[in-house]
């Protein structure tokens, strides 16, 4: 995407008409979002929405520079990423969506590692994640199973970029003697699906709606992670598309007409 900085805002040109409620190639009912907050866009970018780079949104929020994402191929208005104060000062700004959820993001570039049979004692988890950090690897979700009473061992599962997985496994293998774990399990046939929206703060039923939509499609949730305005799940890779569509429909985001993608990738 190209960038053009004007006096008061930054224009970013892409091959789509702006930021959409989901990837239009997966959810045909995806709609352009007229306006979205920095914090929601940060979550969307971190969870796989490729249209804006995470660092670009972080910089814009820090400097309070509104971003206008639009298509190089049309004169249609795009998506404004800005804070509410900027929108109030500019009456021509589109209104915020009333939807509880702003969008559904997905990410197929992650893998999952399970460290099985770790002795459940103080400091083991710290040692594991220090080792991974020392290898320069960022991890995403972490789940620790309840320790087994019989043998006092536990399992820790985490997700990380697929491109870093070999380095992580090699680092952990070197520590197997010190940490005393039984096995390392690797799975790259996964995907992460996330719903993002500031409406979650005031609507308690979001988690139930999301999980019910997944259950009705027969989608098994392998891992769950939440922030104040995001819920992310890990599912098997072959269920990512179904999960995106089901979440998009469950939160009433489907539009009547289909989104236009100008023979590009939305990047």
Sequence positions of predicted segments:
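Polyanion-binding loop/helix "lid" in catalytic or ligand-binding cores
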Residues: 1, 25-76
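Short, small-residue-biased leader/transition segments that mark boundaries at the very start
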Residues: 3-5
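Active-site-proximal structural scaffolding
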Residues: 12, 34, 52-53, 125, ...
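Short beta-alpha connecting loops at secondary-structure transitions
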Residues: 21-31, 36-46, 110-116, 152-153, ...
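General beta-strand structural signal in soluble alpha/beta enzymes
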Residues: 9-14, 53-54, 68-71, 141-142, ...
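A conserved regulatory-domain signal marking ACT and ACT-like small-molecule sensing domains
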Residues: 78-267
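Short acidic, glycine/serine/threonine-rich loops at helix termini
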Residues: 14, 20-27, 31-32, 54-57, ...
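Residue-level "edge-of-site" marker
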Residues: 15-16, 73, 145, 227
């Amino acid at each position: 995407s190209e960038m053009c900085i004007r006096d008061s805002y930054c224009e970013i040109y892409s091959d789509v008409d702006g930021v959409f409620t989901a990837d239009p190639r997966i959810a045909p009912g995806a709609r352009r979002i007229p306006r979205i907050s920095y914090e929601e866009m940060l979550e969307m970018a971190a969870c796989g929405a490729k249209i804006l780079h995470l660092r670009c949104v972080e910089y814009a929020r820090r400097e309070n520079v509104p971003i206008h994402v639009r298509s190089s191929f049309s004169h249609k208005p795009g998506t404004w990423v800005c804070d509410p104060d900027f929108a109030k000062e500019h009456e021509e700004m589109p209104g915020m969506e009333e939807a509880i959820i702003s969008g559904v993001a997905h990410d197929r570039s992650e893998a999952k590692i399970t460290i099985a049979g770790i002795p459940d004692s103080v400091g083991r988890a710290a040692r594991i994640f220090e080792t991974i950090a020392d290898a320069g690897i960022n991890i995403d979700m972490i789940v620790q199973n309840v320790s087994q009473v019989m043998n006092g061992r536990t399992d820790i599962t985490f997700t990380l970029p697929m491109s870093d997985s070999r380095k992580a496994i090699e680092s952990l293998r070197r520590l197997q003697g010190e940490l005393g774990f039984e096995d390392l399990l690797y799975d790259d046939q996964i995907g992460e699906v996330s719903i993002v929206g500031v409406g979650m703060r005031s609507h308690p039923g979001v988690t139930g709606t999301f999980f019910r939509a997944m259950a009705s499609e027969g989608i098994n949730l392998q891992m769950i992670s939440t922030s104040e305005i995001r819920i992310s799940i890990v599912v098997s890779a072959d269920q990512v598309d179904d999960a995106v569509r089901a979440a998009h429909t469950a939160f009433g985001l489907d539009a009547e007409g289909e989104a236009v993608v100008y023979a590009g990738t939305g990047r």
